[in-house]
Amino acid sequence: MAAGNTYSEEVLKATNWLQDNAQKEAFSYVFKTQKVNLNGKEIAWNNYNKDTTDAEMINLQRGAETSWDQATDMEWESEIDSLTKRQVLIFDSLVKKCLFEGILQKNLSPSDCYWFIQHEHGQDTGYHCHVLLGGKGLQQAMGKWFRKQLNNLWSRWLIMQCKVPLTPVERIKLRELAEDGEWVSLLTYTHKQTKKQYTKMTHFGNMIAYYFLNKKRKTTEREHGYYLSSDSGFMTNFLKEGERHLVSHLFTEANKPETVETTVTTAQEAKRGRIQTKKEVSIKCTIRDLVNKRCTSIEDWMMTDPDSYIEMMAQTGGENLIKNTLEITTLTLARTKTAYDLILEKAKPSMLPTFNISNTRTCKIFSMHNWNYIKVCHAITCVLNRQGGKRNTILFHGPASTGKSIIAQHIANLVGNVGCYNAANVNFPFNDCTNKNLIWIEEAGNFSNQVNQFKAICSGQTIRIDQKGKGSKQIEPTPVIMTTNEDITKVRIGCEERPEHTQPIRDRMLNINLTRKLPGDFGLLEETEWPLICAWLVKKGYQATMASYMHHWGNVPDWSEKWEEPKMQTPINTPTDSQISTSVKTSPADNNYAATPIQEDLDLALALEPWSEPTTPTFTNLHLTPTPPDSAIRTPSPTWSEIETDIRACFGENCAPTTNLE
């Protein structure tokens, strides 16, 4: 250390290194030996100094000897004899071998771990070695496993280095004594309620600075203190005793609070106070991760975060803990997100500029029925966003192979947190539908005695349902998506048909009747289809609210909703969705004029308006400009509806309907 307040580079580096690692968690192990008597043969701590031919062991001992010599204060001569020094160097190499082999057995990289080793001699404990071990992938639940592995490795290496001649039986006995006697111990604490031992994690940098660096070095046989220390960053290996104390002092001063806050705690507040355990913190972190990763089932948890799943499964009552953790996760998603939110967040913004909604399989299915597919998709998103009011159910019905289940299954898979109606469970059909973002009813039939409960759920009411083996549980308003080949509005209880339920059921349904059979090679919907549809609708101004729906389409959808109105007509030579618009009828007197829109690019949402606001451009309020002579006018391509009108005019109204080429 230089004069004044200028500190050596080694001291500053060590202090900064401890600051960077102050709050990192680490296991605290103690390696030790015991005095053993086997058939009259005394084995003490200084009898494990057998010569070795292992090159790695020799290199480790040389490195430890270099640290010992450079850390020795030359102002006095150490009274530690050479045999004791050699024994400590051998123990240092054995401890490092045990650490590296244990890390490799766990498939961890030594470069991802940090450690600190200090050899000491205590008044009551004799020789022992403190080891702090932490790193990426080392969690609290692994502490006892590591202790067992280190204990086995430590006993094996001690037998190999024992200089006392032993028979094979005595070697086995010595190893049993080392393993059963736990010659490698782990810092633990006793739980107040369970009275069990749990691993106690320490703060790596704080433990070194406040505890290990303040100890005095052993220089004589009568004194007690430390022999040698080393770490993974080579920061304390060569520090002399005075420099170690200085590093500890600088670290303490840097972490000393500037002001001391004084608080007064009453006896009642102290009684209510509770220390948050490590287990509680771990569960809270796990729940937060599961919510962020949208894990709603045990299978999803196993695939996305197997480490936390195994950690909980290994604890006492692990199955119940996993079940309760998932229940909190699904409840959080159900209360904070809608099914529409979970779909929309999966949209990739990079794909939206090139996205063509008319090329999606969903819109192709709707186009086969000559429907305005933008209107249908807008209505579906409103229901998924809990904006449909009493009409809280999306009903896909019609013959087989018309695309009902394809769309419903795709939406359900995107939502993830889905509950299924179980018709086979007569007493508890909605047992799986609590704390969900969507309820999926596949191939619905006659609801019979459950019709009243069914109507309440389909209308988005908050009701309580019975669960098997449990008490009743509340179902919050949850959108329902349903597919069926039957007429679910006809309710039969026994042999009696109950027509009074027909109209209430219709009032709760967004009726989408699919009748066109799909070809065999139609395929499934792409994973990105509906997220991009939702994002495209938002971009074009079709918000998933009923106010937006009524603004664009005039009224809320009912059972007999005409999805084909307003019609969507695509010119023959412009098949892109950006040019879809409603046709404008003109009179013969207007043929000499061309309608010029007020804005260059008329928004698609505006083009599909079935009516006009005072500020909405229509044919009557567009700026009309004279057109050039007929020879200079490029005749626009006719639309399919105009072609159909001409054919009907030529062949009469009784001609066969034209084929829908859209």
From Swiss-Prot:
Catalytic reactions on record: ATP + H2O = ADP + phosphate + H(+)
Q: How is the cofactor bound?
A: The endonuclease active site can probably bind other divalent cations.
List the residue ranges of the region (DNA-binding): 2-275
Q: What is the required cofactor set for this protein?
A: Mg(2+)
List the active-site residues.
Answer: 211
Annotated GO MF terms? ATP binding; ATP hydrolysis activity; DNA binding; endonuclease activity; helicase activity; metal ion binding
Which stretch carries the motif RCR-3?
Answer: 211-215
Enzyme type, top EC level: hydrolase
- What does the UniProt PTM comment say about this protein? Phosphorylated.
UniProt-annotated stretches for the region Ori-binding = 192-196
Positions of the PV NS1-Nuc domain: 22-262
Give the UniProt subcellular location, in the record's own words. Host nucleus
Q: Which InterPro entries match?
A: Helicase_SF3_DNA-vir (IPR014015), P-loop_NTPase (IPR027417), Parvovirus_NS1_C (IPR021972), Parvovirus_NS1_helicase (IPR001257), Parvovirus_NS1_N (IPR021076), PV_NS1-NUC (IPR049901)
Give an example GO biological process. Answer: viral DNA genome replication
Q: Which residues bind a divalent metal cation?
A: 120, 128, 130
Stored Pfam families: NS1_C, Parvo_NS1, PV_NSP1
Motif residue range(s): RCR-2: 128-130
What role does it play?
Multifunctional protein which displays endonuclease and helicase activities required for initiating and directing viral DNA replication. Also plays a role in viral packaging and transactivation of several promoters. Binds site-specifically to 2-3 approximate tandem copies within the origins of replication (Ori), unwinds this hairpin region and nicks one DNA strand thereby initiating the rolling circle replication (RCR). Cooperatively binds Ori with host PIF and probably other host factors, which activate the nickase function of NS1.
Q: How does it assemble?
A: Homooligomer; when bound to DNA.
Protein name as annotated:
Initiator protein NS1
Q: What is the lineage of its organism?
A: Viruses, Monodnaviria, Shotokuvirae, Cossaviricota, Quintoviricetes
